[in-house]
């Protein structure tokens, strides 16, 4: 693939330089406004359009040891959470550079590992104060509130988002981009929602309402006082409960006032919009899929006697390139594509209930289940092996067809591959056979239709056959949805089946993979938010809190070091402990620099600033104010309240009542941080090439540099 290359200095840490190089390629994927890339193959000159970190790494040369470690970390995050991958890759690069700087200053590796690990654990504990509980989502569903109503008020430079038709509203909100991914709502004690835009945005001087600010701080920080920390990795990082001040490492404290009120999110549409991060079209489909699952559960359980759980394993996608995006929708049942040659079969079956058989493995003559032992000492001698193969498969296909006729089966779902000859025979006899069906789909039809999955067609009996399945075209005019591979979309469903299919369409075939990836990212965000029953306040608040707390911690560590530097050699018996006191402030500041780079790039990518330097300067201004306040979380909430005061001075405050909040999922974000730092520290500790001594100083300049091709 044609990608950039980077000069590598062999005097420095090779593994960390490679990680920084890989991470540099994915900077444009950070944030809600992603810039797509074209990857061109040098050999065949074919190009691929990508807009996600996972697809990018698939196109890079990751054959090196560090590249394989990076790929494993990204795949682990993607396979589990389907979100947080861009954050992981960016922090890998930022923290690799931070570790390189520490090495350049002579900080011992053991100190780097220890302090950075404890620093990240500390951040994971501190961000608990920005948790928003998500409870009783389905008990408080508002049928009058729709996703489209909230989407209408989103303003963004992104082409796939709608812009309000009210030009006065656009002028009032000039410069505020992608409200759904950069806004925040906090409820005060009176319950009235207060809308506020992203924290890190240039603003004019405003006067804050002190009473409102105090109420907001009390409301959101109350949970911190009564919550015991879960992540305790060091005796230096324990937190004291039920006190006026919350204890932090080395005397770091936040003074908070206890209150019985905490902010909660109890609306599905509000939660979905807040987690969409600007991708409204995909999240709207996900929200509709959850609604269908909930309605089906209510019917099956009698008004939901048991708590409803969103089952993401029963959500499927069907991609149909070539159709307009307006054709995308969500339907109950299973939608898939079959060959156009099945058109007369479907017309024959669509007006009648169909009996179904489920085959677990392949439906071929030579298929044998896992663990099958072939009989020994059996030889077949024939003059023509081709005649043997043809006649054998023909006889087998005829036998399968006779079984289907005997039990009046017109629909066969196969988890594996299907014999082409059998498919032809079934089409002629008006029977539909579909292969490569997902195991969850098979299980859903088994539960709803009363069928039993079997490994071989010879195992089929009356008890294994299900009934009541409906087969129909997805559209009333099937020829309108024929793709370039001559396939048509059909719908399979039966009463009570717990399956939902999202039909994804796009006129540009190259963008279908992007659309499907974005759908699953939104689906997993909503899934983990509902599963964990909590989310983070979004819009950069979590990362800024980490940045601020680490800077305060570093300054306090520096003061302690200066206070005891005159006698540390005499008072300390441990070299590690004494070195820790000296280098701890430096390592913490470099760790915090990773968060600052993250926020600067995020702001730059959203086009709020002309350069990353300008964005970094603005963040530095807020950082100084937050550290001076002594309570970063209180400062964050206070800044939000100031923005509220400015917004509600406009004439459109009545319309802003419907502007959505922004949220982040908790565990996927924390795990992305942890995996990024673990990878960097692993590369640091496993790279044994340490360049020191006279032998290396005698190398010429050509030996000390090289190229890393991506």
From Swiss-Prot:
Main location per the UniProt record: other
The entry's keywords: Cell projection, Cilium
Pfam family, one: Cpn60_TCP1
Single GO term (MF): ATP binding
Keyword presence, Transferase: no
Subunit description: Component of the chaperonin-containing T-complex (TRiC), a heterooligomeric complex of about 850 to 900 kDa that forms two stacked rings, 12 to 16 nm in diameter. Interacts with MKKS.
PANTHER family xref list: BARDET-BIEDL SYNDROME 12 PROTEIN
Biological role stated in the UniProt entry: Component of the chaperonin-containing T-complex (TRiC), a molecular chaperone complex that assists the folding of proteins upon ATP hydrolysis. As part of the TRiC complex may play a role in the assembly of BBSome, a complex involved in ciliogenesis regulating transports vesicles to the cilia. Involved in adipogenic differentiation.
Biological process, per Gene Ontology: chaperone-mediated protein complex assembly; photoreceptor cell maintenance
Name this protein carries in UniProt: Chaperonin-containing T-complex member BBS12
The organism of origin for this protein: Pongo abelii (Sumatran orangutan)
Membership in a protein family: Belongs to the TCP-1 chaperonin family. BBS12 subfamily.
Gene3D superfamilies from the UniProt entry: GroEL, GroEL-like equatorial domain, TCP-1-like chaperonin intermediate domain
Any one cellular-component term (Gene Ontology): cilium
Location of the protein in the cell: Cell projection, Cilium
